Amino acid sequence: MSPQTETKAGVGFKAGVKDYKLTYYTPDYETKDTDILAAFRVTPQPGVPPEEAGAAVAAESSTGTWTTVWTDGLTSLDRYKGRCYGIEPVAGEENQFIAYVAYPLDLFEEGSVTNMFTSIVGNVFGFKALRALRLEDLRIPVAYVKTFQGPPHGIQVERDKLNKYGRPLLGCTIKPKLGLSAKNYGRAVYECLRGGLDFTKDDENVNSQPFMRWRDRFLFCAEAIYKAQAETGEIKGHYLNATAGTCEEMMKRAIFARELGVPIVMHDYLTGGFTANTSLAHYCRDNGLLLHIHRAMHAVIDRQKNHGIHFRVLAKALRMSGGDHIHSGTVVGKLEGERDITLGFVDLLRDDFIEKDRSRGIYFTQDWVSLPGVLPVASGGIHVWHMPALTEIFGDDSVLQFGGGTLGHPWGNAPGAVANRVALEACVQARNEGRDLAREGNEIIREATKWSPELAAACEVWKEIKFEFEAMDTL
């Protein structure tokens, strides 16, 4: 008989409740290359030993339940159970531990981020024996990675489509995010693109509201793209948000974008859901559309240090589900992001192979093999004075997105776009000449203002603007 259906002779069924650690805490277990490995930050309830808490996480996120059941005898628990194979205290925190759990690959449906999360985090976070629980990191084995298509195109294919190399890409979120008519919205897009930006963007909550229905917005934005391309000789794009109330409506919007011939669409992957996102990513690959991903709602899940899911896990999940861009924080702007930790998950988005590095919050070595990379998008409270730091921190393979930092220019959208493009080109040239952007950044920007009145005006407006708050996302 196969191990799945084997009934164990001579083993009597004993009803009752027993400690999880007797079955699910296995410190001698040697992890397999095919296991999915998880690092959980566990805060047990008073009186619950850390080994029992870690074993409870392994049990409740795999084969276990609160009591012994007779049907355990109809399967092979050793084959299918999750195992807590390590416990370590969290430095500087009282009663917090990192519990390492290994899951057999047979527990997961191929190519389904939805199923992976339903299994690993679907139920266990409400478990009473735990005061708090946070999923810090996952190691996705190569065998599972290969069941995913991943990003529709990836970094190199995107550069080839846009014919843009050797620098970060520049974007802008159209503001005000809500309330503009479709025609005025398209006008704002055109002015930004003709001023020198590569992309403009729908904000995450621009879908199809009474003041601007999606079809009207798509048409006016497409007109703006083609007009700006004709004037500048550069390929332009606007992230047309296809997020909708149903998957069918989302696909209808993506199909219309393809018919218009625009290069890129957008999806809110957490509010829209992983199933919808993966479906859209498959369509985008099959039809030559780039896919920009917004992470709206992420801070609800990832901001608390002791409970939830760290964004590095959500970033890995997005790379598997599919997206060519994703917002990643800025380090220097108005939104959350500590430098080393942010760069840790930026590498997890872009690189093929990432070594374990606890100083950056990376708990496991991750091999993505042939899965395409994702461009990180720095967006939120950034302006021209931040350009040297952003160029130095994120490098060429990134999108730098200035919403208010473009549209807030005193002379209008197009001069705001000019200011950002001049600042970026000055920083890239200075870096290529061997200058230190971190040390000489302000001087580089001041030198560039001599040749660009638009940049000089932007520098004057935002010279005092800073967002200096302590990051919550620390090790």
Curated annotation (Swiss-Prot):
Signal peptide: none
Residue positions where N6,N6,N6-trimethyllysine is found in the record: K14
Location (main, coarse): plastid
Active site: K175, H294
Residues annotated to bind Mg(2+): K201, D203, E204
Sites bearing N-acetylproline, chain numbering: P3
CDD domains to which the protein is assigned, alphabetical: RuBisCO_large_I (cd08212)
Molecular functions per Gene Ontology: magnesium ion binding; monooxygenase activity; ribulose-bisphosphate carboxylase activity
Compartment(s) of residence: Plastid, Chloroplast
GO biological process: photorespiration; reductive pentose-phosphate cycle
InterPro entries in alphabetical order: RuBisCO, RuBisCo_large_chain_AS, RuBisCO_lsu_C, RuBisCO_lsu_C_sf, RuBisCO_lsu_fd_N, RuBisCO_lsu_N_sf, RuBisCO_lsuI
Binding site for substrate: N123, T173, K177, R295, H327, S379
Reactions catalysed: 2 (2R)-3-phosphoglycerate + 2 H(+) = D-ribulose 1,5-bisphosphate + CO2 + H2O; D-ribulose 1,5-bisphosphate + O2 = 2-phosphoglycolate + (2R)-3-phosphoglycerate + 2 H(+)
Note accompanying the cofactor annotation: Binds 1 Mg(2+) ion per subunit.
Keywords, comma-separated and alphabetical: Acetylation, Calvin cycle, Carbon dioxide fixation, Chloroplast, Disulfide bond, Lyase, Magnesium, Metal-binding, Methylation, Monooxygenase, Oxidoreductase, Photorespiration, Photosynthesis, Plastid
Oxidoreductase listed as a keyword: yes
Site (Transition state stabilizer): K334
Documented EC number(s): 4.1.1.39
One cellular component term from this protein's GO annotations in UniProt: chloroplast
Post-translational modification: The disulfide bond which can form in the large chain dimeric partners within the hexadecamer appears to be associated with oxidative stress and protein turnover.
Miscellaneous remark of the record: The basic functional RuBisCO is composed of a large chain homodimer in a 'head-to-tail' conformation. In form I RuBisCO this homodimer is arranged in a barrel-like tetramer with the small subunits forming a tetrameric 'cap' on each end of the 'barrel'.
Subunit structure, interactors included: Heterohexadecamer of 8 large chains and 8 small chains; disulfide-linked. The disulfide link is formed within the large subunit homodimers.
Main function: RuBisCO catalyzes two reactions: the carboxylation of D-ribulose 1,5-bisphosphate, the primary event in carbon dioxide fixation, as well as the oxidative fragmentation of the pentose substrate in the photorespiration process. Both reactions occur simultaneously and in competition at the same active site.
Family in the record: Belongs to the RuBisCO large chain family. Type I subfamily.
Protein name as annotated: Ribulose bisphosphate carboxylase large chain
Taxon lineage: Eukaryota, Viridiplantae, Streptophyta, Embryophyta, Tracheophyta
